Amino acid sequence: MGRILLVEDEYNVRVLLEHVLIDAGYEVDSAATVAEAKSLLDSVHYDLLLADGRLPDGTGMMLADQAEESGIKALIITGYAFQLAELGRYEFLMKPVRPAELVGAIERILGAPAC
């Protein structure tokens, strides 16, 4: 089982993604802002950061940079096509994300199913 930090500012999207990830067998912590996520990244070990590309106080790429320094893999989800060029070295999915597509991408990045 992998542990995922989910960072999504839209409450309904965050709750939906949490359920998808938990149903797939992952342990999930969530945050709505970069500040909340940084606090969690500093205190808990995660296997994957799943972050929205645009957040109220920064970007998912900022968080991915911090996560990468700690050996944590990152997957960015975005609804903004113009952001794709900024993503560069990070894996990404376009919103809206289908549950099977999300779980498949996570399994590919982590190298194994959750359970």
Regions found by a protein language model. Give the residues of each.
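The feature encodes the CheY-like receiver
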Residues: 56
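Conserved acidic carboxylate
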Residues: 8
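Active-site residues of response regulator receiver
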Residues: 52
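C-terminal output helix
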Residues: 84, 97-115
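Acidic catalytic/metal-coordinating carboxylates
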Residues: 33, 59-62
